[in-house]
Amino acid sequence: MNCDETWCRVRLNNKKQRKGYIWCLINKAAKIVIFFFDEGSRGRKVLTEFLGDANIKALKSDAYNAYYYLDDKECGIEHLCCLEHARAKSYQAWIQGKCEEAKFFLAKIEALYNNLERTYKEHGFTPELIKEGRNSAVTIEIISDIRQRVTQLLSDGIEKSEV
């Protein structure tokens, strides 16, 4: 499952327009897209009440803090962070501040998306072959490099605004 929220202009009870949020939940396997809205709120309560006791094994999202409760083992949902959102944040850090660390992440994500994933599509890989590729030594090495750099940056106390 994928989940994201985005802002939109809302008018509630014929009052003045204001910024509000609409949520989207996608189940690609079942080919289902659900939009949900709760008075324009972006709070965690909107998500937790919508999901309720649904039997969801994993949910992929950006790093917005409303999703952090998914990391709680009691929740039973594995929280997967979206690499595309990480790429976008790295790109933004590079464009706005020429952050050298951002270049590292952009290069690694480029290797995953534009080299490996493009190859899978161009060669018409079956889902089984794509899974093998995504679990290959090359992919694992790239992901390990990213993880090591994130761990290093966190231990060094890099400023939030940089990457």
Model-derived segments and spans:
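Catalytic center-proximal scaffold of phosphoryl-transfer enzymes
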Residues: M1-V163
